[in-house]
Curated annotation (Swiss-Prot):
Record keywords: Chaperone, Cytoplasm, Nickel insertion
Subunit record text: UreD, UreF and UreG form a complex that acts as a GTP-hydrolysis-dependent molecular chaperone, activating the urease apoprotein by helping to assemble the nickel containing metallocenter of UreC. The UreE protein probably delivers the nickel.
Gene: ureF
Xref: InterPro entries: UreF (IPR002639), UreF_sf (IPR038277)
Keyword Chaperone: yes
Primary localisation category: cytoplasm
Superkingdom in the source lineage: Bacteria
Lineage: Bacteria, Pseudomonadati, Pseudomonadota, Alphaproteobacteria, Hyphomicrobiales
Protein task: Required for maturation of urease via the functional incorporation of the urease nickel metallocenter.
Listed name of the protein: Urease accessory protein UreF
Subcellular location: Cytoplasm
Pfam families named in the record: UreF
Family the entry assigns: Belongs to the UreF family.
Length: 232
């Protein structure tokens, strides 16, 4: 049976497509409170951006997203839609603010719909029927990757790196940081992101938790920020 008949994508190409800026999930519309951090003076240059993002990825939502993705992947590998629903419910409940819930759920539902349309799979149809409208982004990515045979280690690294790049791209639009400086930030964060991806398979759902309180408070304040480019 050919790939065209099964709809199964080659692993690497699937990740390039699914996590590219051009994939229709609307990632460009969200800053995960970076817009508020720039307005408040927390992010003013290359160094402060790197520090903020390092904390977000290692102590905040990056680590949490990785854990959720890995467990959604496990549910997909086992064909266990009820387990997937439990992981998704935990993911949505952990969103600390309305805007961050919108950020993950809008992207998650859009991702699920786009993959179902272009890379159909019965497991994706089952998930779409069983899950509520709110589907967390890492949950959708992990589940789809498992169904289509993308290695867990590869999707963890790719997802976390893609999120990092997306946030750096957002920062370039709201802070006095140039493209070369942003590229340096991405390069310096790569080893930490790769190490995080390697650690995540040893973690359980009981290890979920974040310690980025100022970013969470910033997301709340962003809801009433006077001038905004981003939805979060």
């Amino acid at each position: 049976m050919t790939m065209a008949e099964t709809g199964a994508p080659p692993s690497a190409l699937a990740l390039f497509a699914w996590l590219s800026p051009g994939f229709p999930v609307g990632a460009y519309a969200y800053s995960h409170a970076l817009e508020w951090a720039a307005e408040a003076g927390d992010i003013t240059d290359e160094s402060s951006l790197e520090s903020w993002l390092r904390d977000l990825m290692l102590l905040g939502f990056g680590r949490a997203d990785g854990i959720l993705l890995a467990h959604a992947y496990g549910a997909g590998a086992a064909g266990d839609v009820p387990a997937l629903a439990q992981v998704n419910a935990r993911a949505v409940a952990l969103s600390p603010t309305a805007e961050l819930r919108l950020e993950t759920c809008q992207q998650g539902r859009s991702f699920l719909d786009a993959v179902r349309a272009a890379w159909p799979h019965g497991g994706l149809d089952a998930a779409a029927a069983h899950l509520p409208p709110d589907v967390a982004y890492p949950v959708a990515v992990g589940y789809a990757a498992a169904l289509h045979g993308v290695p867990r280690a590869a999707v963890l690294e790719a997802y976390l790196f893609a999120v990092t790049q997306t946030l750096v791209s957002a920062a370039l639009r709201i802070a006095p940081i140039g493209q070369t400086a942003g590229t340096r930030v991405v390069a310096r964060l790569m080893p930490a992101v790769q190490a995080l991806a390697g650690d995540i398979p040893t973690l359980t759902l009981d290890d979920l938790g974040t310690a980025t309180f100022r970013a969470d408070l910033g997301s709340m304040r962003h809801e009433t920020q006077y001038t905004r480019l981003f939805r979060s």
